[in-house]
């Protein structure tokens, strides 16, 4: 009797791949959903995945990569900076503006090989002090302090 039962229901008894696929899919979705929730809690307006600067020939060059984690599409991203020397003397302040659009969970990069910002030879440190996000709907969000998130 068992052999007969096995022969008739053999396919359903041995074919477990669909169940494993479903379980794997549900687990993947669950972990992805949890990751996105943690990411949005830590960086609700986005974060820098990379940035850097140089002052070759006293002219500031700058680049950054930003990922938008907000549902609103970014139209402009203004990155404000200050440059100091090794003892903290202020050498230059300014900002660079990147143009979108940058949709939710998209990242983009901007690069300025040259700029109209010049610094003295002892300029050695740059800090991003503020970011202003202008969204497609015209609203703005100012990011300072712990809202400035770097990967």
Give, region by region, the residue ranges found by the protein language model.
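A structural signal for short, hydrophobic beta-strand segments that form beta-sheets
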Residues: 10-13, 48-50, 123-130
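Asparagine-centered strand-capping/turn motif at beta-strand->loop junctions
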Residues: 65-71
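Short acidic, flexible loop segments centered on an aromatic residue
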Residues: 71-88
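Short, solvent-exposed, Trp/other aromatic-anchored flexible loops in extracytoplasmic proteins
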Residues: 90-151
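Amphipathic, non-membrane alpha-helical rod segments
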Residues: 1-23
């Amino acid at each position: 009797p068992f052999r007969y039962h096995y022969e008739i229901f053999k396919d359903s008894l041995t074919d477990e791949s669909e169940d494993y696929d479903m379980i794997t899919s549900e687990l993947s979705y669950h972990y992805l959903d949890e990751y996105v929730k943690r990411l949005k809690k830590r960086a609700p307006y986005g974060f820098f995945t990379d940035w850097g600067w140089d002052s070759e020939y006293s002219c500031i060059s700058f680049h950054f990569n930003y990922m938008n984690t907000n549902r609103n599409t970014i139209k402009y991203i203004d990155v404000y900076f200050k440059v100091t020397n090794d003892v903290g003397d202020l050498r230059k302040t300014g900002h660079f503006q990147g143009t979108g659009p940058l949709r939710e969970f998209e990242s983009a990069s901007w690069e300025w090989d040259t700029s109209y910002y010049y610094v003295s030879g002892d300029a050695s440190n740059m800090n991003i002090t503020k970011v202003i996000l202008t969204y497609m709907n015209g609203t703005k969000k100012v990011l300072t302090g712990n809202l400035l998130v770097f990967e």
